[in-house]
């Protein structure tokens, strides 16, 4: 049910030309209950750990993990992506966030995916907690870990503020676009 609502929301957003304004001003969203979101986040992490064992080793060194179990992205020239997530500190749900992006350019389709950001130091956690929305690419450095990068990382070579893993991709999105993702705290 949550996935269907997310897809409908993303499709509706993709059809508006005021996408960046409309999604940036939505401070509170209720796509899933707190219990559902916590369960989905924990299940997503377990699935991530089974497919990327390095992520589990990374979790033991991380100060916190920001998990977005289901991001829905859709577009036809104008596009958008939305999902809600939870910040886990010490393995427990602490705060809730949304992930929003708008895009324009040559693109068509819809897809869903999840991602987890491992915040490796107090600086990264503090930035997330005190910022009025974290725009990826501004603030702490984030390294997106793919299969190739994972092979070259070890717990002794970790130097960046945050590491992100994208998982559970479904659907098809043909896209060459300008995108930015903003993570903002939501009330739960």
Label each PLM-derived region with a short phrase.
Residues 5-13, 17:
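Hydrophobic alpha-helical targeting segments used for export or membrane insertion
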Residues 30-188:
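Small-residue-enriched, tightly packed secondary-structure blocks
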Residues 1-3:
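N-terminal secretory signal peptides that target proteins for export/translocation
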Residues 15-28:
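C-terminal segment of classical bacterial N-terminal signal peptides
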